[in-house]
Amino acid sequence: ANWATTRSDASRSIDSGPPMAPELDRQPLLDDPSFRGVAFCRELSARVDAWLRRLWEAADAPTSGAALVAVGGYGRGELSPGSDLDVWLIHAPRTDVSALADRVWYPIWDSDVKLGHAVRTVKESLALASDDLDTATAVLSVRHLAGDESLSAELAEKGLALWRKRSRRWLEEMDRGIRDRHEKAGEVAFLLEPDLKNGRGGLRDVHAIDWAALAGMPLLAGDDVAVAEAYELLLSARVELHRRTGRAA
């Protein structure tokens, strides 16, 4: 089941977990100009990884039957200063993890990090991924953080197999989505503030290239270096926009 994304949606009567939960200090990284682009995103993702593992341990999580995984931009190691933190708590069937979820989510909410989260079994995740493109691509980015690694591996492996099995459907839907996205974002050459994420040639297009390759239909022919350089430039611009404005941009 999906969980609410703000504390106001959750019951105030629930125990928020250990009184001295580990804290995430991002400011030193934000103040260090030597970190930019891909290097910044990888370093921030690594620091958040370590923080979430400490939270998992502080929550007295079991060693089997439950796992915490990163998905989306966080799963890809693309965290910018204003990025949402997308994490799923994956659990075995007939395992009640509601109390564990509260002990993990509340310290994250308390840190003022924007949290996108869900609690599901592997089967539930795959059922959603079989019928929803956003969930299907999220599963492609699953990265294990803490807990039962076999659950994370099962989700990643079966998610990729499902993606390839339904590749024709997903690629056709992706094509329609890309065209709509480009139209909504406008012509880049005429925009004072082009959309670095959703515009033509933006980060979403880089992701689409990767997803097509995972489906067995690569879109590139020996031009990986140029794409990598463009990806670095896009992430560098996005990181600096987040740094200077203090918000997602």
Predicted regions and their residues:
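Conserved nucleotidyltransferase catalytic core and NTase-mimicking acidic/glycine-rich helix/loop elements
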Residues: E23-Q27, L162-A249
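N-terminal regions immediately upstream of nucleotidyltransferase
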Residues: I14-S64, E187
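Conserved catalytic core of two-metal-ion nucleotidyltransferases
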Residues: A46-D49, R53, A59, V97-S150
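Helix-loop-helix transmembrane hairpins and adjacent membrane-interface loops
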Residues: P93, A101-D102, T121, E149-E157, ...
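Short, polar/flexible loop-turn hinges at active-site or ligand-entry regions and domain interfaces
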Residues: H91-V97, L145-G147, K165, P218-D223
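Low-acidity, Ser/Thr- and Arg-rich intrinsically disordered low-complexity segments
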Residues: N2-S13
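Active-site nucleotide-donor binding segment shared across nucleotidyl transfer reactions
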Residues: D49-S98
